[in-house]
């Protein structure tokens, strides 16, 4: 019987299934960070349980670490306590960790793939919503709660119920100026933030196959924003080429065996999906969110929608509330919206490809950050991304134009560290969530691609990067 990619990943990890469908799944890799792991480790200590499989875990501090000078440590006492607690827990249990001043430190969903800890055919969990990122490698990856983090530490298993299968198929050549971020925002705009609820989404089609691994990770990262349990892409040569030679990846004869095994993780011809959604890549244009949900998105050449035209009263109320929070009027041209801050970073868009794309726009425009922009910051996703960008001279491109070049971390994606918006500030952000207060109480977030964010920094408002040439 033909199987989908999700079917194969699920079936190869079933330990036991109850009559009601509840399944005990084996977990190959758990990624840990400082926010959702303290209670899990404390539970182990209280119960006097060991970590079942130490080598299956990898830890890093990312949410609370400063992105400015780290020589003075962490100023906020709560943030410092969380980071110190992860350090001590990993030391006590023997878990591999990249500490704050390790060059390998970075955002958990960036360091996993770049180290080769994320591999095809794996089940991967982390106490973080955007664990779906790792599905780009033909893996089943999703976020879990703190009690589940403890359960995986203790047993290397997890109780789950199988999701339905969805295929999102994107065909055709992506137009100039459009990126993986625009693809996934367009998908969410089409199906909504509840469109994937109850499903695991496989992203396929010629457009997805043409993406780099960085681009595929961006798409899978935001599967959760479409309501899906997980997002994934089939294994191909692009996957294999990315992984070869990375630190955690098998070598020699074991590499050859692994590659042969990994290549099975794709949907069989004739595999049946419960839902299929199709997009034409030629119709995708640079995207900008206007509201307080990723589904509140439109094209750069569009306008802020008018709630009066929405027939659904629930959606109309949500639109009205969003516009009030965002301080926007219906029918406002997107290109006329001015911004106060720029954030280029996050687990969605802080890889070397993203940094290069933003730097290209800055060089192309050849001007400094606009006078109305109070802060434009670039936060690499890891120490290794930062080092690579500096070798290429990209840091100087940004700093010469008036951007701040920071240390790696989650930064302004969420208001959990020193990088945040003040009430009323408007930000062009390459992150994944534009909820009320996400980047700081009263802050207003517009989600865009790195190239779009860079252009907004220079112009002081949103612009259509397709016109840059």
UniProtKB/Swiss-Prot annotation:
Its cofactor is [4Fe-4S] cluster. Pfam families: Aconitase (PF00330). [4Fe-4S] cluster binds at residues 347, 410, 413. PROSITE patterns: ACONITASE_1, ACONITASE_2. Keywords: 4Fe-4S, Amino-acid biosynthesis, Branched-chain amino acid biosynthesis, Iron, Iron-sulfur, Leucine biosynthesis, Lyase, Metal-binding. It catalyses: (2R,3S)-3-isopropylmalate = (2S)-2-isopropylmalate. GO terms for biological process: L-leucine biosynthetic process. GO terms for molecular function: 3-isopropylmalate dehydratase activity; 4 iron, 4 sulfur cluster binding; metal ion binding. Pathway: Amino-acid biosynthesis; L-leucine biosynthesis; L-leucine from 3-methyl-2-oxobutanoate: step 2/4. It is an enzyme of class 4 (lyase). HAMAP family: LeuC_type1 (MF_01026). Heterodimer of LeuC and LeuD. Belongs to the aconitase/IPM isomerase family. LeuC type 1 subfamily. This is 3-isopropylmalate dehydratase large subunit. The lineage of its organism: Bacteria, Pseudomonadati, Pseudomonadota, Betaproteobacteria, Burkholderiales.
């Amino acid at each position: 019987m033909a199987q989908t990619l999700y079917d194969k990943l699920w079936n190869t990890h079933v330990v036991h299934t109850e009559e009601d469908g509840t399944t005990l799944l084996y977990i190959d890799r758990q990624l840990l960070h400082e926010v959702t792991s303290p209670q899990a480790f404390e539970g182990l200590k209280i119960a006097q349980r060991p970590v079942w499989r130490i080598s299956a875990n990898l830890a890093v501090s990312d949410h609370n670490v400063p992105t400015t000078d780290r020589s003075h440590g962490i100023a906020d006492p709560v943030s410092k306590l969380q980071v110190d607690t992860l350090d001590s827990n990993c030391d006590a249990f023997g878990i591999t960790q990249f500490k704050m001043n390790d060059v390998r430190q970075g955002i958990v969903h960036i360091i996993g793939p770049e180290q080769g800890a994320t591999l095809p055919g794996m089940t991967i969990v982390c106490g973080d919503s955007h664990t779906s990122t790792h599905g780009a490698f033909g893996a089943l990856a999703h976020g879990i709660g703190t009690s589940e983090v403890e359960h995986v530490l203790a047993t290397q298993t997890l109780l789950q119920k199988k999701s339905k299968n969805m295929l999102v198929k994107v065909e055709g050549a992506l137009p100039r100026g459009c990126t993986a971020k625009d693809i996934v925002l367009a998908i969410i705009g089409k199906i909504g933030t509840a469109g994937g609820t109850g499903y695991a989404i496989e992203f396929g089609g010629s457009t997805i196959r043409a993406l780099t691994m960085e681009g595929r990770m961006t798409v899978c990262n935001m599967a959760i924003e479409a309501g899906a349990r997980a997002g994934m892409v089939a294994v191909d040569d692009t996957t294999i080429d990315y992984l070869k030679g990375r630190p955690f990846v098998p070598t020699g004869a074991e590499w050859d065996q692994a590659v042969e095994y990994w290549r099975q993780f794709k949907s069989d011809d004739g595999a049946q999906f419960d839902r299929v959604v199709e997009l034409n890549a030629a119709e995708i244009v640079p995207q900008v969110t206007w509201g307080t949900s990723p589904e509140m998105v439109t094209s750069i050449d569009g306008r802020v929608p008018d709630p009066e035209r929405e027939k659904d009263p629930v959606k109309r109320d949500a639109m009205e509330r969003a516009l009030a929070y965002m301080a926007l009027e219906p029918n406002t041209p997107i290109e006329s919206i001015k911004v106060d801050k720029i954030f280029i970073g996050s687990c969605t868009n802080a890889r070397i490809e993203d940094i290069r794309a933003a730097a290209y726009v800055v060089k192309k425009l050849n001007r400094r950050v606009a006078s109305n922009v109070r802060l434009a910051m670039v936060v690499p996703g890891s120490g290794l991304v930062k080092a690579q960008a500096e070798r290429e001279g990209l840091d100087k491109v940004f700093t010469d134009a008036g951007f701040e070049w920071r240390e790696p971390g989650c930064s302004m994606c969420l208001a959990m560290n020193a990088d945040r918006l003040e009430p009323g500030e408007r930000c062009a952000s390459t992150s994944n969530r534009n909820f009320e207060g996400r980047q700081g109480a009263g802050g207003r977030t517009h989600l865009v691609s790195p190239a779009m964010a860079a252009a907004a920094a220079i112009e002081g408002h949103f612009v259509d990067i397709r016109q840059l040439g």
